[in-house]
């Protein structure tokens, strides 16, 4: 029988996660809109990666603790129902806007296939064209989908052969170190283009695995560790936030050296940030992130992430208005499209996912990756 150190908790909505999604998609939108401040959109993607690793691993841990098994069939079916329909709607949107002439970049069958079958990241690494304009963001979804495909198998193996959570975390940490070494080798020894390490699953998967480590050994939902007093943890989270945002705005991360270690540092900084925001939802930061309008944007964030760039580029190509007006119109179009998809597609499918779930995740919590 598998070793279980902690009973599975009853989980519903984890505080602050939807708000963190909203903040992340706002960073990405601001960057792609080329608004003042020079914020780097990749910072938001890093948060998405960590959040996905944390939440998906939490769900798997709860299911395994309750049932002493993980239904891979149900896991993959839930992921398909969550990820595929909005993504294919976004691809259709890009193709329609291209056919109408509002998006002008050429589209190829290969680019559409790369988008649809989750290898857009390596398509971009190969400097191939043909992905519908604005849907280059699907590179990050490809990284996450590779994680969804492989990590459940690894997690089941760890629960069987490494029953203690500390050993599981150590094993994943060793993988993260290997990724860091590989990334550094590519950049500093082979001199590859930083684009190679930015987009590659093999060079970015550690960002997701750090979230998984957090879920396994430091999970606030389980009360795995006795956290410092709220004031101490808040100060640590505040300092980590300042350091994390320095990556978002500073050009220091544009160097090869920073590309090699920067993703690791950012992922580590997110640990105290997530720990505080999950355990202190009544703090001022927690109240902002859990404010209903902000949390609702987090619920819509997956679709908003998918379609914000096509709308931005379409508005810019067609209207010729002042930049800030175009950005505002694109933001409204993005929000309305995402809201419509949520009502017509995501909510009905969330109900279906809940019916096939062994772990009994809440509808909101199951909205895992973005």
What role is predicted for each listed range?
Residues 17-24, 45, 51, 87-90, ...:
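Hydrophobic alpha-helical transmembrane segments of polytopic
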Residues 1-17, 23-42, 56-74, 96-102, ...:
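Alpha-helical transmembrane segments in multi-pass integral membrane proteins
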Residues 73, 77-90:
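Alpha-helical transmembrane segments of multi-pass membrane proteins
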Residues 130-143:
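Individual transmembrane alpha-helix segments
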Residues 143-147, 205:
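Transmembrane helices and adjacent periplasmic/lumenal helix-loop junctions
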Residues 47, 84, 149, 169-173, ...:
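Hydrophobic alpha-helical transmembrane segments
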Residues 89-97:
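Hydrophobic alpha-helical transmembrane segments that constitute the membrane-spanning cores
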């Amino acid at each position: 029988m598998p070793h279980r150190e902690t009973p599975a908790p009853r989980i519903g909505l984890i505080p602050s996660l939807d708000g963190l999604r909203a903040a992340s998609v706002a960073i990405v939108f601001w960057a792609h809109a080329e608004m003042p401040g020079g914020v780097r959109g990749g910072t938001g993607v890093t948060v998405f990666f960590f959040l996905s690793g944390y939440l998906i691993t939490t769900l798997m841990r709860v299911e395994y603790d309750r049932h002493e098994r993980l239904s891979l069939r149900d896991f993959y079916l839930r992921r398909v129902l969550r990820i595929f329909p909005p993504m294919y709607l976004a691809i259709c949107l890009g193709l329609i806007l291209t056919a109408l002439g509002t998006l002008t970049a050429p589209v190829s069958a290969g680019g559409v296939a790369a988008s649809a079958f989750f290898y857009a990241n390596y398509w971009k690494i190969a400097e191939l064209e043909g992905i519908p304009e604005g849907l280059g963001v699907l590179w990050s979804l490809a990284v996450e989908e590779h994680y969804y495909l492989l990590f459940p198998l690894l997690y089941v193996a760890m629960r069987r052969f490494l029953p203690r959570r500390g050993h599981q975390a150590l094993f994943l940490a060793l993988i993260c170190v290997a990724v860091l070494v590989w990334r550094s080798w590519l950049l500093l020894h082979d001199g590859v283009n930083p684009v190679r390490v930015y987009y590659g699953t093999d060079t970015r998967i550690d960002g997701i695995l750090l979230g998984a480590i957090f879920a396994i050994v430091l999970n606030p939902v389980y009360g795995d560790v006795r956290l410092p007093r709220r004031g101490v943890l808040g100060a640590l989270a505040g300092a980590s936030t300042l350091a994390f945002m320095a990556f978002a705005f500073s050009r220091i991360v544009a160097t090869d050296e920073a590309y090699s270690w920067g993703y690791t540092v950012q992922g580590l900084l997110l640990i105290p940030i997530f720990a505080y925001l999950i355990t202190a939802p009544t703090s001022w930061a927690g109240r902002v992130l859990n404010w209903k309008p902000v949390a609702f944007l987090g619920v819509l964030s997956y679709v908003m992430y998918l379609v914000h760039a096509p709308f931005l580029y379409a508005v810019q190509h067609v209207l010729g208005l002042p930049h800030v007006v175009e950005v505002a119109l694109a933001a409204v179009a993005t929000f309305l499209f995402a809201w419509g998809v949520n009502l017509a597609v995501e909510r009905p499918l969330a109900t279906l996912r809940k019916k096939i779930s062994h772990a009994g995740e809440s509808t909101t919590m199951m909205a895992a990756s973005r």
